[in-house]
């Protein structure tokens, strides 16, 4: 039948993938992961062993199968970054940036996916808290919870949203003082100690123990 012919053709042409640019392969594999029918596409990739000709995936057939097995059959990825993060998690990759660099991806993409992988692994061992939400951001953590839900794991969506809403700052640059101000107005010297003080201020504000106002911060010091 047609499907059998297609399958045979895929098997026969798979070695030609070696002659296609990595950038092009990334675009096509990324499209596959983003598609509603991604499971069927990945199943064919595994069955034909075409993955053997893809960067970093030469001996990862069982890990790719694990990706299928772990996620709910009806699940679809919400973004490319989420899809690649879950792929890296299934492959148990310890250096996401190196893996993605070999796929010729952009630095921004590498950073986004690496952050998702790191956030996912933090959630494997801990519940969410203020600093986790501050460190990785609301959007990333909700993508992580989406992956957890697809695997039948407990999720903390409402807790994450509440923690995000309670944060006084969402990025370091929002703090009303910086190293220059501390040196100019308090006579602090540049160096490791100044960096330590700035980290203490940031942590106290994120934890809700210090308001983000100049006078309060000076009193804190």
For the regions a protein language model found, what residue spans apply to each?
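Internal alpha/beta core interface subdomains
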Residues: 1-17
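Conserved phosphate/pyrophosphate-binding and hydrolysis machinery centered on Walker-type P-loop NTPases
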Residues: 3-4, 19, 35, 172, ...
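Short, well-structured alpha-helical segments
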Residues: 4-7, 42, 110-118, 163-164, ...
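Residues within well-ordered alpha-helices
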Residues: 6, 41, 96, 178-179
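Solvent-exposed, amphipathic alpha-helical segments
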Residues: 9, 25-28, 32, 200, ...
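Amphipathic alpha-helical segments that form the core helices of the histone-fold
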Residues: 12, 64-69, 198-206
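Conserved, hydrophobic alpha-helical core segments of structured domains
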Residues: 14-157
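Charged substrate- and nucleic-acid-binding regions of tRNA-handling and nucleotidyl-transfer enzymes
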Residues: 150-221
